[in-house]
Amino acid sequence: MDCCTENACSKPDDDILDIPLDDPGANAAAAKIQASFRGHMARKKIKSGERGRKGPGPGGPGGAGVARGGAGGGPSGD
């Protein structure tokens, strides 16, 4: 007895809730949920050692090149 062949798993269209998209409370709740999830994913990436960078890293086009080690083109203090 497979529930998917008997259509017991699928919901009819009548059971789907119609949520108004212009509700300020719903928009605020959705924004809070999204911010929470994005923070969770950012902390997860940091914990696993990944960097969430978009675009080229140091040394790439428009990058800073050698940014550490004191060999940059900044003021030397001499």
Curated annotation (Swiss-Prot):
Q: Where, per the database record, does this protein carry Omega-N-methylarginine?
A: 68
Q: Where is the Collagen-like domain?
A: 48-78
Instruction: List residues, modification Phosphoserine.
Output: 36
Q: Where is the composition biased (Gly residues)?
A: 55-78
Keywords assigned by UniProt?
A: Acetylation, Calmodulin-binding, Citrullination, Methylation, Phosphoprotein
User: Which residues get modified to Citrulline?
Assistant: 68
Extract the ranges annotated as region (Disordered). 39-78
> Which residues are recorded with the post-translational modification N-acetylmethionine?
1
Tissue pattern of expression reads: In the cerebral cortex, found in the cell bodies of neurons in layers II-VI, and in apical and basal dendrites of pyramidal neurons. Is not found in the dendrites in patients with Alzheimer disease.
Domain named IQ: residues: 26-47
**Alphabetized InterPro entries for the sequence:** IQ_motif_EF-hand-BS
Q: Site: Crucial for interaction with calmodulin. Where? A: 38
* Keyword flag Phosphoprotein: yes
UniProt free text on domains: Neurogranin is intrinsically unstructured; however, upon binding with CaM, The IQ domain adopts a helical conformation.
Q: What does this protein do?
A: Acts as a 'third messenger' substrate of protein kinase C-mediated molecular cascades during synaptic development and remodeling. Binds to calmodulin in the absence of calcium.
The protein, known as: Neurogranin
User: Per the UniProt entry, what species is this protein from, by scientific name?
Assistant: Homo sapiens
Q: Which lineage?
A: Eukaryota, Metazoa, Chordata, Craniata, Vertebrata
Q: Which gene encodes it?
A: NRGN
